[in-house]
């Protein structure tokens, strides 16, 4: 990165330069999500501002903990290790809020300041204006490894042999899209399994009879909540 007053050789230096130019004061708040490659620069150059960290996913490995040790989610490990320099954390649910506080006290001897701010809500239940499409199924999520959409695709391919009317529409974008497309093409399932990308889903859930999910990691499960709210 080349500027009139600086030559920066990596992302960390760029973040540090950016923060310095902001001239942050005690009236400012810096919100961190995942802190990969930027966490240290933010804490070193935040000035008098406050720093908050959003925890939007499972924050630890349930099968890698004991009374003395816990394995944090790698995306939050740096922030948690520097918790005394973080002014507050934000969780999506009260359950996770209480869990974070309890685990910090147990494993780090420190009680952080944690606020609960839900990432979404349903204002009203939604009902289909017309009949739902028979045997139509939907999934909606990031197309990421932990969502395991590939499991759903393979399951639908098998189920199609017994229920020929099945269709499966996949909404979302992500790094797994190419691999999912390959599975669909390999099994010649293009006629009944579709990748439909990002779409506003408010009125679309009502078209389907079944919502599918194989996710093994959910911070809040917003699309699950939306699907339940649509029957």
Regions found by a protein language model. Give the residues of each.
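Nucleotide-activated donor-binding/catalytic signature segment of Leloir-type glycosyltransferases, i.e.
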Residues: 181-198
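A short, active-site helix/loop in glycosyltransferases that binds the activated sugar's phosphate group
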Residues: 40-41, 76-77, 81-112
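Conserved donor-binding/catalytic core segment of Leloir-type glycosyltransferases
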Residues: 90, 129-147, 153-156
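Short beta-strand->alpha-helix junction loop in the catalytic core
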Residues: 58-59, 95-96, 113-126
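Short N-terminal targeting/anchoring amphipathic segment
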Residues: 18-38
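Active-site proximal beta-strand in glycosyltransferases
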Residues: 29-31, 44-63
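Aromatic "clamp/platform" in nucleotide-sugar-dependent glycosyltransferases that forms part
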Residues: 216
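Nucleotide-sugar donor phosphate/pyrophosphate-binding loop at the beta->alpha transition
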Residues: 10-16, 60-81, 85
């Amino acid at each position: 990165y080349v500027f009139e007053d600086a030559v920066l050789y990596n992302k960390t230096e760029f973040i540090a330069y950016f923060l310095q130019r902001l001239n942050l004061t005690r009236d400012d708040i810096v919100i961190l999500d995942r802190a990969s490659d930027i966490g240290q620069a933010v804490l070193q150059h935040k000035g008098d501002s406050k720093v908050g960290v959003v925890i939007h996913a499972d924050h630890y490995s349930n099968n890698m903990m004991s009374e003395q040790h816990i394995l944090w989610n790698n995306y939050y490990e740096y922030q948690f290790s520097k918790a005394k320099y973080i002014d507050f954390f934000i969780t999506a649910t009260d359950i996770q809020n209480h869990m974070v506080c309890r685990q910090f006290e147990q494993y780090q001897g420190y009680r952080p300041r944690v606020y609960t701010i839900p990432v979404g809500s349903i204002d009203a239940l939604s009902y289909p204006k017309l009949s739902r499409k028979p045997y139509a199924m939907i999934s909606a999520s990031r197309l990421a490894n932990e969502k395991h959409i590939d499991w759903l695709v393979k399951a639908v391919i098998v189920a199609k042999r017994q229920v020929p009317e099945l269709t499966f529409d996949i909404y979302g974008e992500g790094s797994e899209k190419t691999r999912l497309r390959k599975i669909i093409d390999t099994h010649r399932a293009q006629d009944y399994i579709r990748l439909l990308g990002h779409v506003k889903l408010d009125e679309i859930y009502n078209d389907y009879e079944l919502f599918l999910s194989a996710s093994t990691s959910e911070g809040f499960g917003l699309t699950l909540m939306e699907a339940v709210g649509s029957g």
